[in-house]
């Protein structure tokens, strides 16, 4: 029977994953809070102390730092000497390590954090197990992100958990532990940047970097321009998160944390033009992110309008010469790798909230057409583009999109029909190929009726209202194709 050690601070999906491992004939060992959760869920699990024959001591500071754990992880299965030494010491092989670390970054993000709190959230045993398992990836599977649970299970069931895939997991581990250690160094060095002011001039502010990863705003290389402001940083982060969702050339423009124009195309120049045309007024003074290198041709287009920040994975030398003619525009070079951090947090009075990032994308095959009329191919393309964008828009959110750009955005309204009115009234075009996209369900049929009055012929929304049928009936009445996804995307 294979053995797995599970010790996680982020408990997302761990119970389901552990149950599946037991069904695949894994014997589970765990520590502290993880073991308690598995026990409560009636998942068969043993204490790591059963491996080490040594109790957890010093309030859990020493749990897994033991030869019985690390010998079982690090042994090279191809070396008889290693296996003989394990046998002599009565040490069992460990085949899988599932660990994520104490939430140091989240802890120190609290402005009132004490030094003792920070120190207690420095993980020692977790990184040690992760690094050991990652080093021995040829024989041991190591998982640091809950997002990888499902694929690991699929590969176990299909007997395709091969060395190449384990190596990809190994890379994630060393990226994760490097960022973790860097966050610790930055905190204790006091690595914070004083900003001119906060959201408004009467508010003081500073920027604390907990990572210097090249795919983050904190790790961006600023090539030109003034110091980033508090609002620049927030808007740039929102812009970057959205543009990374696109594989095709894409451009995102953001104002006040909301997209004002999103465009895709065969080239990045075409994508920018589509984003600009989506709302040529609101982009003025905004933040623009592009997921392809900025060429001289594109730089001329960008230079022609006032922008606060331009983000791209690369700027050619000629493009830089053009853009640097404006002394204040901030130019940020950022790796477009998708952020592997699965959590986000926000401070509230007396504490902070932590949640998984809203990265889930519903596959098209799981979406359901609920009306008599089905979407055309072009309407499907418009829906899927809008569905990528809508999680980045403040709720209540309604987007209008075609297959190359957003054409109208209604954001941050207290009722859904109000958001729809804004999107419809500001739309640069409405025709049979434009889709209406909603981040939440329709509580009644009025939004669909309003859409019909403006000529909308395709709608995508989560569904889930007790009055879903009213909206479906209204769509059928007007010959509108409606798709439900089963997943909402509120953003506050």
Swiss-Prot record:
Family indicated by similarity: Belongs to the PurH family.
GO biological process: 'de novo' IMP biosynthetic process
Organism whose genome encodes this protein: Staphylococcus aureus (strain NCTC 8325 / PS 47)
Catalytically driven reaction(s): (6R)-10-formyltetrahydrofolate + 5-amino-1-(5-phospho-beta-D-ribosyl)imidazole-4-carboxamide = 5-formamido-1-(5-phospho-D-ribosyl)imidazole-4-carboxamide + (6S)-5,6,7,8-tetrahydrofolate; IMP + H2O = 5-formamido-1-(5-phospho-D-ribosyl)imidazole-4-carboxamide
A Pfam family annotated for this UniProt entry: MGS
Source superkingdom: Bacteria
Cited SMART domains: AICARFT_IMPCHas (SM00798), MGS (SM00851)
PROSITE patterns, sorted: MGS (PS51855)
The keyword Transferase is assigned to this record: yes
Lineage, highest ranks first: Bacteria, Bacillati, Bacillota, Bacilli, Bacillales
Enzyme Commission number: 2.1.2.3, 3.5.4.10
A Gene Ontology molecular function term of the record: IMP cyclohydrolase activity
Pathway involvement of the protein, from the record: Purine metabolism; IMP biosynthesis via de novo pathway; 5-formamido-1-(5-phospho-D-ribosyl)imidazole-4-carboxamide from 5-amino-1-(5-phospho-D-ribosyl)imidazole-4-carboxamide (10-formyl THF route): step 1/1; Purine metabolism; IMP biosynthesis via de novo pathway; IMP from 5-formamido-1-(5-phospho-D-ribosyl)imidazole-4-carboxamide: step 1/1
Gene3D superfamilies assigned: 3.40.140.20, Methylglyoxal synthase-like domain (3.40.50.1380)
First and last residue of the signal peptide: none
Keyword Disulfide bond part of the UniProt annotation: no
GO cellular component: cytosol
Keywords from the named record: Hydrolase, Multifunctional enzyme, Purine biosynthesis, Transferase
Domain MGS-like: 1-144
Record-linked SUPFAM superfamilies: Cytidine deaminase-like (SSF53927), Methylglyoxal synthase-like (SSF52335)
Protein name: Bifunctional purine biosynthesis protein PurH
Domains as described in the record: The IMP cyclohydrolase activity resides in the N-terminal region.
GN (gene name): purH
């Amino acid at each position: 029977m294979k053995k797995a050690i599970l010790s996680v601070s982020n408990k997302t999906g761990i119970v389901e994953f552990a149950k599946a491992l037991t069904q695949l004939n894994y014997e589970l060992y765990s520590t502290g809070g993880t073991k308690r959760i598995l026990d409560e869920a009636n998942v068969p699990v043993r204490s790591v102390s059963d491996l080490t024959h040594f109790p957890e001591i010093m309030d859990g500071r020493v749990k897994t730092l033991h030869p019985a754990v690390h010998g079982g992880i690090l042994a090279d299965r191809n070396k008889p000497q290693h296996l003989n030494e394990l046998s002599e010491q009565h040490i069992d092989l460990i085949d899988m390590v599932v660990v994520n670390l104490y939430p140091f970054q989240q802890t120190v993000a609290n402005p009132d954090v004490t030094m003792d709190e920070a120190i207690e959230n420095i993980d020692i045993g977790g990184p040690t197990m992760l690094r050991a398992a990652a080093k021995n990836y040829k024989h041991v599977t190591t998982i640091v992100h809950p997002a990888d649970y499902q694929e690991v299970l699929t590969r176990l069931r299909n007997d395709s958990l091969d060395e190449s895939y384990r190596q990809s997991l190994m890379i994630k581990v060393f990226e994760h532990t490097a960022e973790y250690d860097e966050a610790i160094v930055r905190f204790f060095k006091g690595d914070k940047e004083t900003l001119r002011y906060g959201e408004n001039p009467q508010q003081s502010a500073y920027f604390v970097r907990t990572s210097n990863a090249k795919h983050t705003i904190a790790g961006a290389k600023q090539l030109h321009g003034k110091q980033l402001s508090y609002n620049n940083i927030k808007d740039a982060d929102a812009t970057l998160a959205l543009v990374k969702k696109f594989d095709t050339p894409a451009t995102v423009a953001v104002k006040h944390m909301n997209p004002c124009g999103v465009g895709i195309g065969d080239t990045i120049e075409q994508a920018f033009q589509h984003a600009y045309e989506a709302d040529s007024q609101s982009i003025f003074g905004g933040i623009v992110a592009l997921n392809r290198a900025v060429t001289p041709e594109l730089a001329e287009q960008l230079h022609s309008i006032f922008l606060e920040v331009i983000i791209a994975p690369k700027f050619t030398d000629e493009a830089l010469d053009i853009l640097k003619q404006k002394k204040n525009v901030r130019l940020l070079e950022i790796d477009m790798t998708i952020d592997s951090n699965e959590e986000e947090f926000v401070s509230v009075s007396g504490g902070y909230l932590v949640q998984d990032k809203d990265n889930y994308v519903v596959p098209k095959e799981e979406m359901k057409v609920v009306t008599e009329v089905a979407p055309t191919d072009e309407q499907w393309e418009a829906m899927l583009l809008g569905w990528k964008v809508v999680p980045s828009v403040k709720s209540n959110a309604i987007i209008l999109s075609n297959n190359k750009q957003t054409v109208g955005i209604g954001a941050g309204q207290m009722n859904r029909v109000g958001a729809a009115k804004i999107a419809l009234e500001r739309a640069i075009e409405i025709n049979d190929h434009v889709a209406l996209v909603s981040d939440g369900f329709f509580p009644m049929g009025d939004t669909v009726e309003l859409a019909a009055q403006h000529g909308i012929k395709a709608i995508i929304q989560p569904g889930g209202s007790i009055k879903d049928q009213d909206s479906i009936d209204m769509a059928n009445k007007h010959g509108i194709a409606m798709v439900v996804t089963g997943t909402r995307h509120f953003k506050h």
